[in-house]
């Protein structure tokens, strides 16, 4: 009798607990539809021998003896041939696909077949004929559909993480996270539970007019010849930066930009940022030279830098949550042997010996084995099937099989290049720094994480939606790059937090400051920038729906930079006074579309500029920070949402959340901008004028300039600019502005610019302006 499919929340034995894969908070991954394939008289699938073999780049994860060499040796040596044959037979028998028909002739399909996908959802190769920004403006409906799907998954995921982290020990309260004891400043616990939900924020896709490297790319991107010529001239230009404080960069090579005006504009900004970093001798946090190594762990080797001296922690101090489970090791963190270790190791080794001759189903079999599925049942993986079919037509079957093998090779390196213990950012653990290769090993292991783990790619692979096929393109592109030409450097993940009393002191010191400098960019997108802090419109669970069907701002960023997914393994659900900082993530892909129209695209110059090696710091990290801050979800009519947002507790909560994120780098970054946009709007129904004002206050508290990307809403941006100019003319301080938005009153009917109108009323009356100088402190609000 076949055993049932693994169900979420099923009781597990102590032995199974030892083998748990990546665990923690996050989304539950529903199990794929369980179907048997129709049996036929045929044996294993046969593949055409006429496929031309493309020349391959060297794979850095391939052992000194390649699979080809192994197979050639086996032809000459009967003993080797017998061993390889046995390995192949064992793997194939486990899946029991000897009687399964060829992939090309599968007759039983899910409701959405590959052919249906091709006919109803074309690849939209000519999407650049319409501005990506226009697409994003009309994507609220897509956002809400995705949001509704993920709301249920988040609730299920919280239950899953409770099951996975079940432990007899009573966990000690984490030091360093001070709980609020009053409700004057913050939303009460019950309000937080109902107000803070997943974030699917509307942002535009990347600009469609990319500058191509040849005429073909130029035609696809819609870039004119004049723009290419202008960008080429700018690309040839370099600026010598002379500084006595640092030699980090002697020349700045300008990256291509997607449009002529943007290229020139951004070149000027980039030069300013370089000068600010060099003259200020700035180091993005964590500064590994100065931080406490017992709280800030470095797991990689950095040239000319001492080995990390972080202390070894006891599991029982914080419970099992503190150590990231490593299912691929022979022993767990408590020294207990994993009986399944050799089984999984043999499966990976066996697959890599015969993947070229056994085809697509061998990779499916490997996944089934690693997921511990019933060997008598074949589970459908529609997205993987569609990816295999589509890419085989484009690059050839052999290359697609090689892509699968690269994932397995990188996953195998985890045991060798990762430390025995990786501490999650709980308790007093503040940060973790890993190399690009270590990040790749962790992400590759997510392919083989069991479906009951919140951090498994099983949900993507088993989906029948075309968006998941696009996600696989992002992921396999990442592993291709990491196999062929991996970047050399490191990435830091840090939990930044502040207790209530400390924040109140910060506010008292800074509420008399003038408003910060604010610049508006109608065309530039957040991901077009470098040498700055980029805002991630985050979910309280980092990564949002990237492992499901989510495909808006945060998910797109994580697909462009898959290393960010490591943060999902390390971080728990964000609390009210927390933000998550990621420093040094590399960009591997570009994109077009947004939401359900998202498409993978080759890496373009406007996105690759932050990968410039000259921008790396002494620890090997790229000088760019992504700061994840989650906003409140508002529900109801437009009037209900607007009224609820003007509640003082909600204004204070959003201002604190943004301020803590913007202050993540400390007081020295006064010339390094924060690049943001309509945070908390879109599917979260945020009031755009109010969210803009809140971010202005937060940037002022952090004493940093604000670069605001309006995402194709120039009229609204013009109103934002006008109100800022008026307030500066009136010498409005941060405290005065905070007082204004806290005393706007409630609207009788919805009006988009209600907040701006109320501020204008204050500014028009000198008496009101003077009276607002006696601004109440945040602690009394």
Swiss-Prot record:
EC code: 3.2.1.143
A Gene Ontology biological process term: regulation of DNA repair
InterPro entries the record matches: PARG_cat_C (IPR046372), PARG_helical (IPR048362), Poly_GlycHdrlase (IPR007724)
Signal peptide: none
Consequence of changing residue 594 to A: Reduced poly(ADP-ribose) glycohydrolase activity in vitro
Keywords: DNA damage, Hydrolase, Nucleus
Domain of life: Eukaryota
Catalytic activity: [(1''->2')-ADP-alpha-D-ribose](n) + H2O = [(1''->2')-ADP-alpha-D-ribose](n-1) + ADP-D-ribose
GO cellular component terms attached to this protein's record: cytoplasm; neuron projection; nucleus
Start-end of Basic and acidic residues biased regions: 106-121
Keyword Transferase on entry: no
Single Gene Ontology MF annotation: poly(ADP-ribose) glycohydrolase activity
Subcellular location: Nucleus
Disruption phenotype: RNAi-mediated knockdown results in increased sensitivity to gamma irradiation.
Outcome reported for the amino acid change (mutating residue 536 to N): No poly(ADP-ribose) glycohydrolase activity in vitro
Its biological purpose: Poly(ADP-ribose) synthesized after DNA damage is only present transiently and is rapidly degraded by poly(ADP-ribose) glycohydrolase. Poly(ADP-ribose) metabolism may be required for maintenance of the normal function of neuronal cells.
Family named by the database record: Belongs to the poly(ADP-ribose) glycohydrolase family.
Identification of the protein by name: Poly(ADP-ribose) glycohydrolase 1
Species, as recorded: Caenorhabditis elegans
């Amino acid at each position: 009798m076949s055993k049932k499919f693994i169900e979420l929340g099923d009781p597990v034995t102590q032995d199974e607990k030892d083998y748990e894969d990546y665990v923690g908070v996050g989304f539950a991954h529903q199990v794929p539809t369980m179907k048997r394939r129709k049996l036929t008289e045929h044996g294993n699938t046969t593949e055409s021998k006429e496929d031309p073999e493309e020349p391959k780049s060297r794979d850095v994860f391939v052992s000194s003896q390649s699979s080809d060499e192994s197979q050639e040796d086996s032809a000459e040596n009967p003993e080797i041939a017998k061993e390889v044959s046995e390995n192949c037979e064992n793997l194939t028998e486990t899946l029991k696909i000897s009687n399964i028909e060829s992939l090309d002739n599968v007759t039983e399909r899910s409701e959405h077949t590959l052919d249906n996908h091709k006919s109803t959802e074309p690849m939209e190769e000519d999407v650049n004929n319409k501005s990506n920004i226009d697409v994003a403006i009309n994507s609220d409906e897509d956002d809400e559909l995705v949001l509704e799907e993920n709301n249920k998954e988040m609730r299920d995921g919280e239950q899953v993480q409770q099951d996975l982290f079940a432990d007899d020990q009573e966990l000690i309260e984490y030091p360093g996270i001070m709980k609020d004891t009053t409700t004057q400043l913050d939303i009460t616990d019950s309000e937080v539970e109902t107000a803070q939900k997943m974030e699917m924020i509307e942002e535009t896709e990347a600009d469609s007019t990319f500058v191509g490297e040849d005429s073909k790319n130029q035609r696809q991107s819609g870039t004119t010849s004049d723009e290419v010529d202008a960008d080429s001239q700018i690309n040839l230009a370099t600026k010598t930066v002379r500084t006595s404080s640092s030699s980090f960069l002697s020349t700045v090579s300008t990256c291509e930009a997607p449009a002529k005006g943007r290229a020139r504009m951004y070149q000027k900004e980039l030069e300013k940022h370089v000068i600010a970093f060099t003259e200020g001798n700035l180091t993005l946090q964590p500064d590994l030279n100065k931080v406490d190594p017992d709280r800030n762990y470095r797991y990689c080797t950095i040239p000319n830098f001492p080995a990390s001296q972080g202390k070894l922690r006891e599991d029982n101090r914080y419970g099992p949550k503190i150590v990231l489970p490593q299912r691929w090791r022979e022993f767990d963190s408590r020294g207990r042997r994993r009986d399944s270790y050799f089984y999984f190791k043999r499966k990976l080794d066996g697959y890599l010996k015969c993947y070229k001759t056994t085809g697509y189903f061998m990779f499916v079999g490997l996944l089934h084995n690693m997921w511990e599925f019933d060997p008598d049942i074949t589970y459908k993986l529609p997205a993987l099937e569609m990816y295999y079919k589509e890419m085989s037509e484009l690059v050839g079957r052999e290359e697609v099989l090689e892509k699968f093998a690269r994932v397995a090779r990188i996953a195998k390196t985890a045991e060798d290049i990762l430390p025995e213990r990786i501490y999650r950012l709980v308790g007093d653990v503040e940060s973790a720094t890993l190399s690009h290769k270590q990040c790749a090993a962790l992400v590759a292991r997510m392919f083989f994480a069991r479906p009951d783990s919140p951090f498994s790619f099983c949900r993507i692979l088993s989906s029948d939606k075309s968006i998941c096929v696009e996600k696989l393109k992002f992921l396999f592109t990442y592993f291709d790059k990491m196999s062929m030409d991996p970047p050399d450097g490191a990435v830091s993940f840090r939990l930044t937090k502040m207790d209530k009393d400390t924040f109140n002191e910060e506010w008292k010191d800074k509420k008399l400051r003038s408003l910060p400098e604010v610049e508006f960019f109608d065309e530039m997108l957040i991901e077009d920038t470098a040498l700055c802090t980029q805002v991630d419109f985050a979910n309280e669970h980092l990564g949002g729906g990237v492992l499901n069907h989510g495909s808006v701002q945060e998910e797109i960023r994580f697909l462009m930079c898959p290393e960010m997914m490591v943060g999902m393994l390390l971080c728990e659900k964000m609390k009210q006074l927390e933000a998550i900082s990621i420093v040094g993530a590399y960009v591997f892909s570009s994109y077009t579309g947004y939401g359900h129209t998202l498409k993978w695209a080759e890496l373009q110059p406007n996105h690759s500029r932050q990968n410039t090696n000259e921008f790396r710091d002494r620890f090997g990290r790229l000088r760019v920070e992504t700061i994840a801050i989650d906003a409140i979800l508002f529900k109801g009519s437009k009037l209900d949402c607007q009224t609820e947002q003007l509640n003082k507790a909600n204004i204070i909560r959003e201002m604190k959340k943004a301020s803590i994120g913007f202050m993540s780098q400390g007081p020295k970054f006064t010339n390094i901008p924060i690049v943001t946009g309509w945070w908390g709007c879109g599917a979260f129904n945020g009031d755009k004028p109010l969210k803009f004002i809140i971010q202005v206050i937060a940037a002022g508290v952090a004493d940093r300039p604000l670069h605001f990307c309006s995402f194709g809403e120039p009229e609204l941006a013009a109103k934002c600019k006008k109100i800022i100019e008026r307030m500066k003319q009136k010498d409005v301080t941060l405290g005065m502005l905070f007082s204004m938005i806290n005393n706007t009153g409630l609207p009788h009917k919805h009006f988009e610019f209600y907040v701006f109108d109320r501020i204008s009323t204050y500014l028009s009356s000198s008496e009101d302006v003077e009276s607002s100088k006696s601004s109440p402190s945040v602690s009394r609000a």
